[in-house]
Each structure stands twice: as C-alpha cells, then as structure tokens.
Amino acid sequence: MALTKAEMAEHLFETLGINKRVAKEMVETFFEEIRQALESGEQVKLSGFGNFDLRDKNQRPGRNPKTGEDIPISARRVVTFRPGQKLKSRVEEANAKK
C-alpha cells in the first residue's frame, strides 16, 4: 500500500488538530517547494530523510523492443533520491522486526 498526499493531510488533521483544508494546503505547499527547487536546478536536502538531486544523463543507444530497431535515447536530466542514514536505519529496523 502506498502513502498518498490525502493520507498525509489526514494525518496532519488528526495529530495537529488543524482544519482539513489547511492540512491539504500544507502538504501541497511542501511538495511545491520541492518541485520549484528542483526545477531551478537546486539540490533538496531533508535532514534525517534524504536528498533529492538532479543528474544529467548522456545520450545513449537504445533498442525498440518490438522491432529491434536501434534508436538513440536522448540526453536528459533526471531526479534521483538518496536516502539519509537515519531513514535507512529505520527501514532496516522495521524490516528486522517483521
């Protein structure tokens, strides 16, 4: 099961007692800030969680799986996420308990 933005907003509503509309706006604003930073080429560092980085990938050869035809895969910029040590540790601990 995946955690959704709606579930995050609901959790804020329940734990902080703020109104649902405000909770939804907080979640949307959080993600919009991350989007804007990445769009402007900035790294996003969330202490205790991880880093969102931009990585440039060079053009490379590819192949159409249906036809076998060689096609170039164009150069592009991708977003990568590197989890922080605290997040890694918590995930490992949670998996060890299962």
Swiss-Prot record:
Keyword set, alphabetical order: DNA recombination, DNA-binding, Transcription, Transcription regulation, Translation regulation
Family matches, as PROSITE patterns: HISTONE_LIKE
InterPro entries: Hist_DNA-bd (IPR000119), Histone-like_DNA-bd_CS (IPR020816), IHF-like_DNA-bd_dom_sf (IPR010992), IHF_alpha (IPR005684)
Keyword DNA-binding on entry: yes
Gene Ontology BP, a term: regulation of translation
Region described as Disordered: spans on this chain: 49-71
GO molecular function per UniProt: DNA binding; structural constituent of chromatin
GO cellular component term, pick one: cytosol
Function: This protein is one of the two subunits of integration host factor, a specific DNA-binding protein that functions in genetic recombination as well as in transcriptional and translational control.
Subunit-structure text: Heterodimer of an alpha and a beta chain.
Record family assignment: Belongs to the bacterial histone-like protein family.
Name of the protein described by the UniProt record: Integration host factor subunit alpha
Annotated source species: Shewanella sediminis (strain HAW-EB3)
